């Protein structure tokens, strides 16, 4: 844990604050054009494709189709599972010169920004061609193996990468959950979310950003 945090080049203050949080394992299964990101089952053996460590626990899932640039997010909101479809968000990245080794791969640093003001630090490898990564982050010339959002005191990093041949059944969009696709369904979801969280003064588009936010 300490070694991986130092690899990401985080400040001592950020690393100290991260130690207060609980970490857990996530799996990222992927092929040449698709991926699915989900919390690792507690009874899984240590032979999964890719692990990411991140604070908190979750049973949510994120499926991404990079050919069609679409994704399906299964997210538990107010005690119910919802299926949320949208396009893969575009992030403008600035590629830096810094190099780090993560899980045996040479990774280059990149800096991006989400929600206008939140900076993201990523480390990607061009040895894995899929332009994906944990939490749906994508758009770099290879797989993201390290990710940090200093403002949120949150970090993800790959601890193991392995190749398998028979796992296509794992890379499927989630199907169990309440659908929220039409304008009417989304409006109803926003109203429920507003009542549940008390965000009466927040604009609907900002609430949707929260709903479609992190998979965690």
What is each PLM-predicted segment?
Residues 1-216:
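Extended soluble regions of mature proteins
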